[in-house]
């Protein structure tokens, strides 16, 4: 992670890393915290960069802990439970976090867009990704009622979406617009390229731009925040 940050930003731009669900898989997954920024070994934390305050939320895996795919190697439910308490702690200490002097923008970063209505089913007609509905709804409520974030940044879905509160994606009460900006694509010759997202924050507005790895802008939209 540190090498990626160095190659991308050259030490001139602050970088924030959000662990994804695939990072929990593999022989070295339990050692990942040795190779990426964290807070006391935790992959969820809050940060302050100038006038920006943000909180990273880590949903862990995207299916139940007892899913056969994991072979009994993950234990994400208690991990998410601790994050509920962490969010409550930040609310109780708001004067030193999102309500601190000089904070103009409040962001939520989560690889998994936990407020999304994910209806994808498996071969048996089950919905393995539709998990933790009560907990994720509680996270959304706490963030919306107390933190009042302006934007949530996500990936995971391999798509490009701007979901406003109350949209067809929102079934848990989004606290703010949710931006999903991470999509791998293939060229006609089979080689891959990537589409990402850039967001420019201005007083009262955010410019969202989806741009591919070849420098082409696919979509640009300004949101009121």
Predicted regions, residues:
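Short active-site segment of divalent metal-dependent hydrolases/proteases
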Residues: 23, 114, 159
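Extended active-site neighborhood of metal-dependent phosphoesterases/phosphodiesterases
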Residues: 1-97, 129-130, 138-139, 149, ...
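Metal-dependent active-site segment of extracytoplasmic phospho-/sulfohydrolases and closely related
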Residues: 149-157
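A short C-terminal boundary segment appended to hydrolase-like catalytic domains
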Residues: 189-190, 197-225
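Active-site glycine-centered loops adjacent to acidic/histidine catalytic or metal-binding residues
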Residues: 20-21, 111, 155-156
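Active-site-proximal segments of metal-dependent phosphoesterases and phosphodiesterases across multiple
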Residues: 76-80, 95-150
């Amino acid at each position: 992670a540190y090498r990626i940050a160095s190659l991308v930003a050259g030490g001139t731009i602050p970088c924030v890393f959000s662990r994804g669900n695939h990072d929990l898989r593999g022989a070295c997954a339990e050692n990942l915290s040795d190779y990426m920024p964290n807070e006391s070994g935790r992959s969820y934390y809050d940060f302050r960069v100038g006038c920006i305050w943000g909180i990273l939320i880590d949903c862990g895996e995207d299916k139940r802990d007892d899913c056969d795919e994991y072979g009994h190697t993950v234990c994400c439910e208690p991990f998410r439970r601790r994050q509920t308490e962490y969010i409550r702690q930040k609310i109780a200490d708001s004067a030193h976090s999102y309500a601190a002097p000089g904070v103009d923008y409040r962001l939520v970063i989560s690889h998994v867009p936990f407020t999304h209505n994910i209806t994808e089913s498996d071969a048996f007609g089950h919905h393995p990704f539709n998990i933790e509905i009560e907990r994720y709804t509680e996270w959304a409520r706490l963030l919306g009622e107390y933190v009042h974030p302006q934007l949530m940044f996500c990936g995971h879905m391999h798509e490009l979406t701007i979901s406003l509160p109350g949209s067809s994606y929102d079934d848990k009460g989004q606290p703010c617009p949710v931006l999903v900006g991470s999509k791998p694509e293939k060229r006609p010759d089979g080689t891959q390229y990537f589409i990402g997202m850039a967001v420019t924050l201005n007083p009262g507005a955010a410019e969202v731009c989806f741009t591919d790895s070849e420098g082409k802008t696919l979509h640009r939209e300004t949101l009121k925040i």
